[in-house]
Each structure stands twice: as C-alpha cells, then as structure tokens.
C-alpha cells in the first residue's frame, strides 16, 4: 500500500487490512525516494492510498471498503486456491 503518515484514508485502509490479518507492506511517499513516481506508474493515480493485493491494483480506500462490503476482500487476501 502506498500511503503517507498523515492521510486519514490511509489510516482507515491500514486498520481494515490489519483487522483482516493481512501481511501489509506500506510504502510511505514522504519517506521513500521516487515512491510517488513508482505509485503513479503502477496505478495511474496520484492520490493515496493506492492499494495492491499481490500484483492486483485494488484502488484506494473507497474501493477497498466496497470490496469488504461486497464480501470479496477476504478471498482476495487469501489468494488463489492451491492447484
């Protein structure tokens, strides 16, 4: 998740993902050189948070909450079934 320490939407997304036991890797745009450039290249968006589950771009906080409301977030976090 690309984020900043002062972003309320980032905090909301972080809390939800932590409550799900997700292995959360945060990239703070204020602390990591070139992180914003990388985020925009990967997501084509300039706002934070930008959330990826694996390599899949989920979107921002609103999209994450929509996935949770639709009952789809847990299966995304669990990953694909073993083959």
Set out the residue ranges of the language-model regions.
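Structural alpha/beta surface segment adjacent to cysteine/selenocysteine redox centers
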Residues: 20-23, 36-48, 52-58, 62
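Thioredoxin-like thiol-disulfide oxidoreductase module
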Residues: 29-46, 72-83
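Short, glycine/charged-enriched secondary-structure capping and boundary segments
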Residues: 15-17, 40-41, 66-67
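Non-catalytic, surface beta->alpha helical segment in thiol-disulfide oxidoreductase systems
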Residues: 53-82
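Local sequence-structure signature of Cys/Sec-based thiol-disulfide redox active-site neighborhoods
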Residues: 1-23
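Residues that form or flank phosphate/diphosphate-binding pockets in enzymes
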Residues: 8-11, 34, 59
